[in-house]
Swiss-Prot record:
Keyword annotations from UniProtKB, A to Z: Cytoplasm, Metal-binding, NAD, Oxidoreductase, Zinc
Protein name, as recorded: L-threonine 3-dehydrogenase
Keyword Nucleotide-binding: no
Site feature Important for catalytic activity for the proton relay mechanism but does not participate directly in the coordination of zinc atom, where: 148
Known function: Catalyzes the NAD(+)-dependent oxidation of L-threonine to 2-amino-3-ketobutyrate.
Pfam families assigned to the protein according to its UniProt record, in alphabetical order: ADH_N (PF08240), ADH_zinc_N (PF00107)
Residues at which NAD(+) binds: 175, 195, 200, 262-264, 286-287
Reaction equation(s) it catalyzes: L-threonine + NAD(+) = (2S)-2-amino-3-oxobutanoate + NADH + H(+)
GO biological process: L-threonine catabolic process to glycine
GO CC, alphabetical: cytoplasm
Pathway assigned to this chain's UniProt record: Amino-acid degradation; L-threonine degradation via oxydo-reductase pathway; glycine from L-threonine: step 1/2
Length: 341
């Protein structure tokens, strides 16, 4: 079958021919319809320091997808041939304390689809049936293919009560923009997103944020004054991993504010801890999606009217995958969809 693989320790992704995966007793075989390119896939393409430490080569990559069930393991119940599914990309052990306690998203033995085991940039994918999520009929293939990153956004945004709150989102990548849209949809008062990429800030405006602020030429404090904010932000969603953005967030949080962090900062990032302590801030790290509460919330948000369509900016056939990666690497894109049909 056709598959996009990391073949060697160098920049690039290559189209390859690999054997179709075998279906285990508890697995589903999924025929891929559409995939989306994640920032993680760009890291793998670029072969940066994280990729060099993490990705065994050769490896079929990719973990954002929608497809159709075409094979079912003999122990699997609850699925049938033809079901349209996406899936949780974190394969968990089922045996550690967190898994046994129902906190599977915190499994210490997590294996990543398209990172540590063969991924979805292929004609067929095998995953445990436990990880598959049936897509409701009124959700499109395009939207279903970005459920993985949308789940990161939903998990982060809904970590805290947002109704009536002023929310600061730092980082207008696709996940940050989707998190801001979720916050607005569920009843936040002001949702302000910051970045220095004007293209992505314009996408955020299309998604309905209160203000999209280019901090290279506009003061966040001035925007807060303009919005009539006198006490700071109640909730911060840190999506950028950029130390200056996080420091600005700490400066502008209200006392007792809550911060959810999805962005990955440098390991040696320094902050003024006095602001955390004396403001009484609560900081929560976010990884992946809650299994499977986040998935149910994703579907419900879209079915209740949340419009994510502006975040999908580019569509290519799989034979034009290089154009898709070029668009993602340029920084002038939202989500990029690759069609396998």
């Amino acid at each position: 079958m056709k598959a996009l693989s990391k073949l060697k320790p160098a920049e690039g992704i290559w189209m390859t021919d690999v054997p179709e995966p075998e279906v285990g007793h508890n697995d589903l075989l999924i025929k891929i319809r559409k995939t989306a390119i994640c920032g993680t896939d760009v890291h793998i393409y670029n072969w940066d320091e994280w990729s060099q430490k993490t990705i065994p080569v050769p490896m079929v990559v990719g973990h954002e997808y929608v497809g159709e069930v075409v094979g079912i393991g003999q122990e699997v119940k609850g699925f049938k041939i033809g079901d349209r599914v996406s899936g949780e990309g974190h394969i968990t052990c089922g045996h550690c304390r967190n898994c046994r306690g129902g906190r599977t998203h915190l499994c210490r033995n997590t294996v990543g689809v398209g990172v540590n085991r063969p991924g979805c940039f292929a004609e067929y994918l095998v995953i445990p049936a436990f990880n598959a999520f049936k897509i409701p009929d009124n959700i499109s293939d395009d939207l279903a293919s970005i459920f993985d990153p949308f789940g990161n956004a939903v998990h982060t945004a809904l970590s805290f009560d947002l109704v009536g709150e002023d929310v600061l989102v730092s980082g207008a990548g696709p996940i940050g923009i989707m998190a801001a849209a979720v916050a607005k949809h569920v009843g936040a008062r002001n949702v302000v997103i910051t970045d220095v990429n004007e293209y992505r800030l314009s996408l955020a405006r299309k998604m309905g944020v209160t203000r999209a602020v280019n901090v290279a030429n506009e003061s966040l404090q001035d925007v807060m004054n303009e919005l009539g904010m006198t006490e700071g932000f109640d909730v911060g969603l840190e999506m950028s991993g950029a130390p200056p953005a996080f420091r600005t967030m700490l400066d502008t949080m209200n006392h007792g504010g809550r911060i959810a962090m999805l962005g990955i900062p440098p390991s040696d990032m320094s902050i003024d801890w006095n602001k955390v302590i004396f403001k009484g801030l609560f900081i929560k790290g976010i990884y992946g999606r809650e299994m499977f509460e986040t998935w149910y919330k994703m579907a419900a948000l879209i079915q209740s009217g949340l419009d994510l369509s502006p975040i999908i900016t580019h569509r290519f056939t799989i034979d034009d995958f290089q154009k898709g990666f070029d668009a993602m690497r340029s920084g002038q894109s939202g989500k990029v969809i690759l069609s396998w049909d």
